[in-house]
Amino acid sequence: MSPSTLPAPAPGAASGCPPQIRRISPVPRVLRYPANSLVLVAGIPGAGKSTMLNRLFGMTGRESATVRTRAGVRVVDSQQSRNRLHPLLSAVHYPLWRPLMHLLHYLRILAALRRGGPVVVHESGTRGPVRRLLGWYCRRRGVEVHLLLIDSDPGDALRGQIQRGRQVAPRSHRTHVRRWRRLLAACPAGPGAVVPGARSLLLLDRGRAGDLAEIRFTPGPALPAPGGAAAGAVP
């Protein structure tokens, strides 16, 4: 089942989500995208992004570099950057080198895009300038952007942070939640309202993200340009 042929979304509600946000139900087992694509997996910290990517791409969470699968998919998770820097900076309080970790993560995303082929990226999505930069860079490279958003109740996300052993500061958590709600409010205007030039958008709640079995990249024609698609639907 390709993003362009997903069933019509059914109304759904999750905490903090505007009522007009709609989700695909049931969740497709396999998502297919054109080979020259960036799939941006976004959600607040603790939403389950790394958990899903580790499961789908056979990762452990201990990697310290971009993972390239046998199928040629490059998977870029911010935890890889943290793992790479930690041995060098473990004596320094993490908040002091967090900006360096983010910078390394963004540089690795750009490097993966320069190499071509499919790229899957872990990113909170709550930083507007980062979303705009990715949209601009992908347009320059001729790469399609597809959005896979994982929505989570803030309390569940906080518990997810505690479970993984990496908890963001309370103030930072509130900021992520506030920005995420603004992102969700923009979704009904179409994928391009979230990331300029994005071609598709799929919104899953935290629980249903576990139903997804595979993200597959296949040669084929590009999807039509977005034109005000509803959230959860794909043009």
Predicted regions: what they are:
Residues 28-36, 112-114:
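Phosphate-binding P-loop
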Residues 38, 47, 59-63, 70, ...:
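Conserved GTP-binding G-domain of TRAFAC-class P-loop NTPases and closely related GTPase folds
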Residues 96-145:
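Glycine-rich phosphate-binding loop used to anchor ATP phosphates in small-molecule kinases
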Residues 1-30:
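N-terminal pre-Walker A segment at the start of P-loop NTPase domains
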Residues 80-83, 126, 151-156, 208-210:
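Conserved nucleotide-binding/hydrolysis micro-motifs of P-loop NTPases
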Residues 141-160:
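Conserved phosphate-donor/acceptor-positioning beta-strand/loop module used by diverse small-molecule
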Residues 41:
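Hydrophobic anchor at the beta1->P-loop junction of P-loop NTPases
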Residues 51, 55-115, 156-158:
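Conserved substrate/cofactor phosphate-moiety recognition/catalytic segment
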